[in-house]
From Swiss-Prot:
GO terms for biological process: protein secretion by the type II secretion system. This is Type II secretion system protein N. Its main location: membrane. It is found in: Cell inner membrane. Belongs to the GSP N family. Transmembrane segments: none annotated. Keywords: Cell inner membrane, Cell membrane, Membrane, Protein transport, Transmembrane, Transport. The lineage of its organism: Bacteria, Pseudomonadati, Pseudomonadota, Gammaproteobacteria, Aeromonadales. GO terms for cellular component: plasma membrane; type II protein secretion system complex. Involved in a type II secretion system (T2SS, formerly general secretion pathway, GSP) for the export of proteins. The keyword Transport applies. It comes from Aeromonas salmonicida. The keyword Cell inner membrane applies. InterPro entries: T2SS_protein-GspN.
Length: 47
């Protein structure tokens, strides 16, 4: 969190075998997975 109340989150999501099938079907909305099966996540905004 910056002094002007802005934030930036960068990370990734790697679905495991325990992830429900319904959630796996929604993963393409996050984009393409990398070579290790991780979906990139990046969010920014102001609180």
């Amino acid at each position: 969190l910056q002094a002007n109340r802005q934030y930036l989150f960068q990370g990734s999501l790697k679905p495991g075998p325990e992830l429900p099938e319904e959630m796996k079907q929604g993963l393409p909305f996050l984009g393409q997975p990398d070579g290790q099966g991780r979906f990139p996540l990046r969010y920014q905004g102001r609180i």
